[in-house]
């Protein structure tokens, strides 16, 4: 899973990336300090995995991960190649979802490319560039569909749908906002439009905003309103604070967060939100050799989940021995869970649940 962090120059994008990955991306007070996309892999926070590690004392501990890509900033005209526009559009096409960092903090020492802080304007600037790029891509697909229609009338519905999407884009709306049936969703996915990607607006705020209550910030309220229109999620975060606490030990970090009235870091909330945004869940495997979280889509059946470990597991699937995490914790050991009949034997049609602890039986 790959997530692209985007935003106008000097909104705190690279500061947030540094805090997430400790990759040390150069973060400077001028545009385009992130010329090449920096990539970092970060663990998905999961306290269940920690509990299993305490129980099994494994030789290896492997959490689920998300890949973040810090993508170079863009400016007005990016869809026409202005600034680093061509590079930006190329890099953003490769990600599964977008984290759009929006500046909601005031600071005279940090220049804004437009000269003032206005999150609605900033969001609309990037949205416009993505929409313009999408129109160009969609027009090519529409031309192709029109040619196919001349030979086969079955393409009429496809053409009508794409024209409806284009109409939405021309009105400044995202492809994501277009109402679709299941077949139309597949059609839309086949075009790979930028504005169809899932998105989270990371509202980058000051410590003072958090202390005063983020919901009281007019800038945050503006982001919330626009996110609702965009069918997007929104998460308040203080990138500077996250960067400062990223190097602290867990106890110091918790103390710092408590002072801000928070129970978990903004980064943990962001990572969890991204995981949820993409419709992902984790199942767990546990034993002395390794405790591990495996990432799958919601709705995945047991054989396909087994295939995440190895293709042989899916090909030769016999059954899955499954226990719910809470049941295992209540029993204290896997043996006790089996004695109480809490370890279930599930077949090929079983739909995996988040937090399932599984042992797959297979034969090839």
Question: Where are the language model's segments positioned?
Answer:
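Conserved Switch II/interswitch segment of TRAFAC-class P-loop GTPases
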Residues: 40-45, 72-82, 93-155, 168-181, ...
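Short, intrinsically disordered, mixed-charge
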Residues: 22, 54, 90, 94, ...
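Amphipathic alpha-helical transducer elements in NTP-driven molecular machines
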Residues: 32, 46-49, 62-68, 82-96, ...
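C-terminal-of-GTPase-core extension/linker across diverse P-loop GTPases
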Residues: 2-6, 11, 17, 144-351, ...
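Generic signal for short, ordered secondary-structure residues
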Residues: 14, 31, 67, 105, ...
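Conserved G1/Walker A P-loop phosphate-binding module
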Residues: 1-111, 139-140, 144
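Glycine-rich, flexible loop/turn motifs
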Residues: 23-31, 38-40, 48-51, 80, ...
């Amino acid at each position: 899973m790959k997530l692209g962090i985007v935003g106008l120059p000097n909104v705190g994008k690279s500061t947030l990336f540094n805090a997430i990955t400790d990759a040390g991306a150069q973060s400077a007070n001028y545009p385009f300090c992130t010329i090449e996309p920096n990539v970092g892999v970060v663990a998905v926070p999961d306290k269940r995995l920690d509990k299993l590690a305490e129980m099994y004392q494994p030789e290896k501990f492997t959490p689920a991960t998300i890949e973040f890509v810090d993508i170079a900033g863009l400016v007005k005209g990016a869809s026409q190649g202005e600034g680093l526009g061509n590079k930006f559009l190329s890099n953003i096409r490769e990600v599964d979802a977008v984290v759009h960092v929006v500046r909601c903090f005031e600071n005279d020492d940090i220049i804004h490319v437009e000269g003032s802080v206005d999150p609605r304007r900033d969001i609309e600037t990037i949205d416009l560039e993505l929409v313009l790029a999408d129109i160009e891509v969609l027009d090519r697909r529409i031309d192709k569909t029109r040619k196919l229609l001349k030979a086969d009338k079955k393409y009429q519905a496809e053409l009508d749908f794409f024209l409806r999407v284009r109409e939405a884009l021309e009105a400044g709306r995202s492809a994501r906002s277009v109402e679709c049936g299941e077949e139309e969703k597949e059609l839309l996915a086949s075009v790979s439009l930028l504005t169809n990607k899932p998105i989270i607006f990371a509202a980058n705020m000051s410590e003072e905003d958090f202390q005063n209550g983020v919901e009281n910030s007019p800038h945050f309220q503006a982001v919330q309103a626009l996110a609702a229109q965009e069918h997007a999620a929104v998460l308040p975060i203080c990138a500077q604070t996250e960067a400062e606490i990223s190097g602290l030990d867990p106890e110091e970090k918790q103390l710092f967060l408590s002072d801000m009235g928070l129970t978990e870091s903004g980064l943990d909330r962001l990572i969890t939100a991204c995981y949820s945004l993409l419709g992902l869940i984790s199942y767990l495997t546990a034993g002395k050799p390794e405790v591990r979280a495996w990432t799958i889509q919601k709705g995945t059946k047991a054989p396909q989940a087994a295939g995440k470990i190895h293709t042989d597991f899916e090909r030769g699937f016999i059954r899955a021995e499954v226990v719910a995490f809470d049941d295992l914790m209540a029993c204290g050991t896997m043996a006790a869970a089996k004695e109480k009949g809490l370890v279930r034997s599930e077949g090929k049609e079983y739909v995996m649940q988040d937090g399932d602890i599984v042992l797959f039986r297979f034969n090839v």
